[in-house]
């Protein structure tokens, strides 16, 4: 459910982007609805609404959600202010690389890597597996950031589709691969598997 809620602003962005631009009047003001700039405005507004509602309900936002919201406001705001989609194209790479930096930094700061802090309450794994998993997430975010940057500046007509569905597909594939990997190692930390049989 949380992943779906986080996806709502991006989905609305995609829908508005795909609309043919058309003149619209609201409160006595005329503007063009549809295309990249209307979609960017929708992304900003819907992000504020969604994450604002989550904050009111839970009293806080997760760090990842806060980073996503701030990046949306900054890069989306710059896109509208300078009327240049270049700023928005940098949003996904920068966010992914900041996540990679956070995961990498956790190897040197604190007593647990970041993935263990996130998933440790639900899984018991050997420390070496946690470390490998954390490194895998670092690689995933680096690759996602690079892929988004490459597509955004190489395939002008395709980058929004990739931003929404390509990144989602990469995430699903990675999570499936992670599940397969974890299934091979969960028993390593299960005390019951190390007990001798009578």
From Swiss-Prot:
Q: Does the keyword Glycoprotein apply?
A: no
Family matches, as InterPro entries: YciB
GO CC annotation terms, alphabetical: plasma membrane
Residue ranges spanning the membrane: these are: 36-56, 64-84, 90-110, 135-155, 162-182
Q: How does it sit in the membrane?
A: Multi-pass membrane protein
Q: Where in the cell is it found?
A: Cell inner membrane
The text of the family note is:
Belongs to the YciB family.
Q: NCBIfam families from the entry? A: ispZ, PRK00259.1-3, PRK00259.1-5
PANTHER family in the record:
INNER MEMBRANE-SPANNING PROTEIN YCIB (PTHR36917:SF1), INTRACELLULAR SEPTATION PROTEIN A-RELATED (PTHR36917)
Q: Report the function annotation for this chain.
A: Plays a role in cell envelope biogenesis, maintenance of cell envelope integrity and membrane homeostasis.
Record-given protein name: Inner membrane-spanning protein YciB
- What lineage does UniProt assign to this protein's organism? Bacteria, Pseudomonadati, Pseudomonadota, Gammaproteobacteria, Pseudomonadales
